[in-house]
Amino acid sequence: MTMMIITVFLTVIAAVLAILVKNSQTGSGIFAPPEISGSRDVFPSAKVVNLTGASGPESIAFDPAGEGPYVGVSDGRILKWRGEPLGWSDFAHTSSNRQECARPFAPELEHVCGRPLGLRFDKKTGDLYIADAYFGLLVVGPAGGLAKPLVTEAEGQPFRFTNDLDIDEQEDVIYFTDTSARFQRRQFLAAVLNVDKTGRFIKYDRSSKKATVLLQGLAFANGVALSKDRSFVLVVETTTCKILRLWLSGPNAGTHQVFAELPGFPDNIRRNSNGEFWVALHSKKGLFAKLSLTQTWFRDLVLRLPISPQRLHSLFTGGIPHATAIKLSESGKVLEVLEDKEGKTLRFISEVEEKDGKLWIGSVLVPFLGVYDL
């Protein structure tokens, strides 16, 4: 009888939350995504470059010749854009087991097919370095094909959710994140809701082939970006909505502090040619997300609700698909906020890459890239 009462109670709560989220879809409900002062709602005018038979272009990279972009997609492939009319072509993949990897979006097969997330080219060699959520840090040559694993563990602990990277070519090292020791990529929302703090920030020395943990205890370690002068590296902590700065040289070398606190959940971070940083927010931080992350009783209730992951994601993101990109200075000051407040064109963005007067915009969920003219 007690279990029946609890089930009925949770079902009622889920129904109430669903109604509140539906009301939020008008932009005025209590769970609606918050407004950001000074933001410009310009992304509805962005163009889209559709993917054919693929989805989730999480990360974006251009090769040393300026060709591309290249994107990693949900079925484990890395695609190259060859422009109109050629469109997209297969460039590389992270798993040799491709027999079952034909569906554009199949989270249950990610551990078989691979899920390439962060992408970075070595400007000298043309090699593409890949952070695959399931297969660790990999590399593939300029001709593409099957990527080769470089490292799958650090200090005796295997990677569980390799996420993003950046390359310091002068020091011959790669900085990258392992998001969680408990959750895999297809459980990303559970990692956030459980306030998991087992993420790591790692340095891989290409000469010694050794991986060293630089930071640990991170709450969803995510995007990585090296500063223009290489004096510091930034690492995104998604759950706390913060970006951390780890000093690599100078009097503060080896120490870290908060570089920026953001109004939403940051994913990847990318530096532009001026040394500024573009941060993509998966979503803004509304009331539901705040309560889930700060009130234990509310979080415990949410985790017990009999609702689908899709409905839970809708609750967490405020019921309105939207897109937010923030440009930060080298000191962490907010310079610009660009949005698609109602998700008319872009939504749930994962990365913003600035190149030749355009912003190329990825998403872990949608079947296209966004392109916005600055």
From Swiss-Prot:
Signal peptide: 1-18
Alphabetically ordered keywords of this record: Glycoprotein, Signal, Vacuole
Pfam families referenced in this protein's UniProt entry, alphabetically: SSL_N, Str_synth
Keyword Nucleotidyltransferase in record: no
Glycosylation sites: N50
Gene Ontology CC annotation, any one: plant-type cell wall
Cell compartments where the protein resides: Vacuole
TM spans (from-to): none
Family membership: Belongs to the strictosidine synthase family.
Protein name, per record: Protein STRICTOSIDINE SYNTHASE-LIKE 10
Protein's organism: Arabidopsis thaliana
Name of the encoding gene: SSL10
